Amino acid sequence: EAAELKKSGNVQELVVMGCLSERYPEELKNEIPEIDRIFGSSDHRQIVSFLTGKEFSKDDPLFFRSLMTPGHYAYLKIAEGCDNGCSFCSIPLMRGLQKSRTIPDIMAEARRLADQGVREILVIAQDTTSYGWDFDKKVYLSDLLRELNTIDAIEWIRVHYAHPAHLAQRIIQAMADCDKVCSYLDMPIQHASDPILNSMRRGLGQEGIRDRIHRLKTAMPGLALRTTLIVGYPGETENDYNQLRDFVEEIRFDRLGIFTY
């Protein structure tokens, strides 16, 4: 449709960006010759320079991010890509392996957001709990949370997209210790049947997930827990489904998202 608009003169340039262009740039060029520019999911600097006509500089106020959210909160991405290789997910193919941002870089953005009036930081990545593992000298999500907790103007820090297999005790303890970290966690478990979890390559069975939840709620009484599940996964039997249903009834998640495969 956009290509037709360009042919008719209603669109000056056709630009494609995101996961699709990251994975299939050559195929897009061949299939849609009207495309002028292709950007991958990590080409932020090139995109900004293309839009402004100016060379990107992260210290230039022109390039400070604009908020896409209401002014009191903002998402703070701490890493891009994923090393997990879950069988149902193509993120490593689309976005590559994990590339963590340094703590000083993240802190600089968080302080700029605070100066803009942001009071709640939502920490995100494909897997926040494996943050920093890709550095030669490893750092951990726990280290980052303790640093973010020192920013005076930030009042709340909310952690999203924790992987239960990577939820180390050091992270749980940091969440409990930091007064600005909300008693809330978004931790997708995907399923609760061991055969399905194994097929999904999740790295943790039902008992391990139960243990992580127990440790979380022991450290943070009143914790609000959100999760997501996949039903209808290939090979899922009625018994697998019933195990999942029973686990959900047992845990009583505060928020629950369910997707069909």
Placement of each model-derived feature along the sequence:
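Conserved SAM/AdoMet-binding glycine-rich loop
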Residues: 12-18, 23, 115-238
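Conserved N-terminal phosphate-binding loop of PLP-dependent enzymes in the Aspartate aminotransferase
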Residues: 153, 252-253
